[in-house]
UniProtKB/Swiss-Prot annotation:
One term under GO cellular component: extracellular region
Transferase as UniProt keyword: no
Coiled coil: none
GO BP annotation list: proteolysis
Signal peptide: 1-20
Keyword vocabulary terms for this entry: Glycoprotein, Hydrolase, Metal-binding, Metalloprotease, Protease, Secreted, Signal, Zinc, Zymogen
Protein name: Extracellular metalloproteinase 2
Source taxonomy: Eukaryota, Fungi, Dikarya, Ascomycota, Pezizomycotina
Propeptide: 21-244
Cofactor(s) needed for function: Zn(2+)
Length: 637
């Protein structure tokens, strides 16, 4: 493997904390007066944890079948008798647990928000499962002899009109695609890729509505809009693959320019996670910031996705990406190559770290060539530095496995000179973690599983949590408080409502603080605060590894509390149901520890959640949550 020198903007070993868009973020459609939060899906979701499965004789005694998929199918038939469904995805995690994902169908059409995930243990028995299947009356099938629905092009026009999309749709027509009941939308302008309409059902207000699922990528928002297929006048729900954020960066372990100096790092790639290195996809080697995991470039000109591969990026025939950068430079385009290099470096380091922790090809990670390791492939990340489409933010769009993701890093103009968030590792980590949480929750093939308000907020929380965890310093203790994005925002206390702290006087937020929230970032601040408590409980028990990568025991588990917490939380994402809430996600994390360690850390995990009101009797209600500060009997015995 050819070696190369990479000038990272410090020694990128410990990414900092924040990432997510600030509370004052101006998201694409928000600037047009459209509140996408009001269109979020609201279907009920349940999660049956390992303890509940074990205490239910009818489930625990379920006969093991020849394969995990067959065992999981029998469970679905038992839990939801009479339901029709298809296998949407499945894989076996690095811990031996099989994850099988089902999509509900009705009259031969998908129920787009009807999901059932079954986690099958290494012994072949059901470990836990999540369920959002519809159980009401199935409507009469639409007529095949005559169309009872509006035309797909009309649904597209309705979506454009209702959401005030920056798209020209007046001349739009539709053409059938190979997939049944799926149409390509032609003769429109303003989208990144060709729009598509597919006939599906969606659960809404306790019923199934027949809808056209209209897919439109308008760059700032990559949308699935569910337009009523009968009258075309109502939009039942909207899913947005994009997740916004904004923050700072330099070398792994240096979060931003306030923490250290730039240095040259030689061959930093992990040979197992990136077997082709960072500048090859296994079939071709590149002399620029392009490889199997991502391609980084400058997009100040705000070019569309079809032009990404032609955007300017640094070129070095000897792979020495060494470029000047000055904090005093007012013309940020003069250090464009340094910005692109930093973004490429930090994203690749994080890709490799997540791979070591279990976010691999089968689980839906981001690579062009999966090299026979499973998963869909063809989906690295487009990494746009100094993106010209916005200021004071960052953005990550996560389509399903097999489609390339997109990260856009903006300039921040709250200081003089402006600050470039590609030099803030916490922003990059926050954004990339949106890809992690979206690919794991509900399975790699389903990117619609963090779109209810609470689960969407938790997505922001996971992104903050991983940014904070990777930022911890050698001298930090549980008394150390962390802001989100203080450097890039120019605000010492960062951009969240409260610092991340185990001190209830510094951060008083508990479970009921979620009740009045109507936006995802305040909810994420609460969820990440709970995870911060769990993190320090595990560090106090197992110690803290301050190296850039974890050490593993003979069972493949991190030996320290920091990386173990990251591993357990990641495993919880894979276990939890599509669109979880705080309670079901907590249960999935407890279950994750049970899978990984046999429950060795249940006391520390429960104490962390119970301290913030998410104890054993906490109950979810959309407007009136019930707090609990009690521990389950015997967990700390």
């Amino acid at each position: 493997m050819r070696s190369f020198l990479l000038a990272s903007l410090a020694s990128v070993a410990t990414l900092k904390s924040a990432q997510a868009h600030p509370a004052h973020s101006t998201r694409g459609l928000s600037k047009r007066g459209i509140d996408l939060d009001s269109y979020r899906l609201k279907q009920p979701v349940s999660y049956t944890n390992a303890n509940d499965v074990g205490s239910d004789a009818s489930i625990s005694s379920l006969t093991r079948r020849a394969t995990a998929e067959e065992t999981a199918s029998e469970l679905v038939k038992k839990v939801v008798p009479g339901a029709t469904f298809r296998v949407a995805d499945n894989y076996v995690g690095s811990n031996g647990v099989a994850h099988v994902y089902f999509k509900q169908t009705a009259n031969g059409l998908d129920v787009d928000n009807g999901d059932f995930n079954v986690n099958v243990g290494r012994d072949g028995t059901v470990f836990s499962f999540g369920n959002s299947f519809y159980t009401g009356d199935i409507p009469t099938a639409p007529s095949k002899s005559k169309r009872d629905t509006i035309e797909p092009a009309a649904a597209f026009k309705s979506a454009v009109s209702v959401l005030d999309l920056p798209v020209s749709a007046g001349s739009a027509t539709s053409e059938p695609k190979e997939a049944e009941n799926t149409f390509a939308i032609k003769q429109s302008e303003g989208t990144v890729s060709e729009p598509e309409a597919r006939l599906v059902y969606v659960q809404t207000n306790g019923k199934l509505a027949l809808t056209w699922r209209v897919e439109t990528d308008v760059l700032s928002n990559w949308l699935l809009t569910y337009v009523d297929a009968i009258d075309g006048s109502q939009v039942h729900a909207v899913v947005d693959y994009s997740a916004d954020a904004s923050y700072q960066v330099y070398p792994w372990g240096i979060n931003d320019p306030t923490e250290g100096e730039r240095t040259i790092v030689v061959d930093p790639f992990d040979k197992q996670a990136s077997e082709f290195g960072w500048h090859s996809d296994g079939s071709k080697t590149y002399d620029t910031t392009r490889g199997n995991n991502g391609v980084a470039q400058n997009n100040w000109a705000n070019k569309s996705a079809s032009e990404y591969l032609n955007l300017p990026r640094p070129v070095s025939t000897d792979l020495k990406f060494h470029y000047p950068y000055s904090l005093n430079e007012t013309d940020f385009q003069k250090y464009s190559n340094a910005s692109v290099t930093q973004l490429f470096y930090t994203s690749n380091v994080y890709h490799d770290l997540l791979h070591k922790l279990g976010f691999n090809e089968q689980a839906g990670n981001f690579e062009i060539n999966n090299n026979g390791a499973g998963g869909a492939g063809n989906d690295f990340v487009f990494l746009n530095a100094q993106d010209g489409s916005d200021f004071n933010n960052a953005n990550f769009a996560t389509p399903p496995d097999g489609q390339a993701a997109r990260m856009r890093m903006y300039m921040w103009n709250g200081t003089t000179p402006f600050r470039d968030c590609s030099f803030d590792a916490s922003v990059i980590i926050h954004e990339y973690t949106h890809g992690l949480s979206n690919r794991l929750t509900g399975g790699p093939a389903n990117s619609n599983c963090l779109n209810v308000l609470e689960s969407g907020g938790m997505g922001e929380g996971w992104s903050d949590f991983y940014a904070i965890a990777t930022h911890l310093k050698a001298g930090d203790t549980r008394e150390t408080d962390y802001p989100m994005a203080p450097w890039v925002s120019g605000k010492p206390n960062g951009i969240r409502n409260y610092l991340y702290s185990t001190d209830i006087n510094v951060n008083p937020q508990t479970y009921i603080y979620v009740d009045p929230q109507t936006r995802v970032h305040p909810i994420g601040n609460i969820w990440a605060g709970m995870l911060y408590e769990v993190l320090w409980n595990l560090i106090d028990k197992h110690g803290k590894n301050d190296a850039g990568t974890p050490d593993f025991d003979s069972n493949g588990l991190p030996t320290d509390g920091k990386y173990l917490a990251m591993k357990i939380v990641m495993e919880g994402m894979a276990l939890q149901p599509c669109n979880p809430n705080f309670v079901s996600a907590r249960d999935a994390i407890v279950d994750a520890d049970k899978i990984l360690t046999g429950g060795d850390n249940k006391c520390e995990i429960w104490k962390g959640f119970a301290k913030r009101g998410l104890g054993k009797d906490a109950k979810y209600d959309r407007v009136a949550r019930t707090e609990s500060y009690d521990l389950p009997e015997g967990v700390c015995a």
